[in-house]
Amino acid sequence: MKARPRARKRYGQHFLEPAWADKLVAAVDPRPTDRFLEIGPGPGALTLRLAPRVAQLVTVEIDAELIAALESNAPSNVVLVHGDFLDFDLAGLVRAGPVRIVGNLPYNVSTPILFKLIGDHRRAGGIPDAILMLQREVAARIEASPGTKDYGVLSILVRLHAGVSRLLTLPPGAFRPAPKVHSAVLRLDFRPPPVSLRDEEAFEEMVRSIFTQRRKTLLNALRPFAEARGTDSRRALAAAGIDPTRRPETLDVHELARLAEEVA
């Protein structure tokens, strides 16, 4: 009997149990013509279930031992890439056609991976959706609405580019070894932003700046960013039609877009 792979703490590995891998494949709803990229296949619980149902499956795994273990039983339509997904050329892959994303993300790098996917979508397109397993608290931040404690930079920047829906919630026992937290599977359906932005980088910079002071009034939270661009925060807020006594966490994406345009 082949030994089960050992999860490595330094990679934040928690391997999905077979019954939950079946549920995740059902939630993904793969089609025979689909091309997929899987982030962190681990020992292949999802890989080996998904591959027979799709045209191509590219996997990116940082752990060389897991890649070696998968090589012996991966189907011919699976491409195994040893490396860090944060360094992977996703734009090169989508040149051949759309690529759906799936992955059980390590908790310690889930946010950088989310921002990489957003950046790749912005630059190259070709990513219809991403079905991602995340720590439940991270999922809650992405789903959060204006005025709630979880609403912030991650909520705004992810939902600027994608519709978000929750597919599954998983207990710690869905993984081996069991983490100390619950997990959730979100589906991100990538699309153009629902607002018009002349300078998206300035928008992102403003959002990050004002949310470092999310409990201050907008008049004060906006001031450092506005002054750095030669603009008065009170004038910009008035021009955008936003009450300067509100707090950053109460603004929706449309209000933030208007404000960014006035400052820029």
PLM regions and their residue ranges:
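Catalytic cores of RNA-modifying enzymes
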Residues: 1-209, 238, 249, 258-261
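C-terminal lobe and adjacent flexible extensions of AdoMet/dcAdoMet transferase-like proteins
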Residues: 190, 207-264
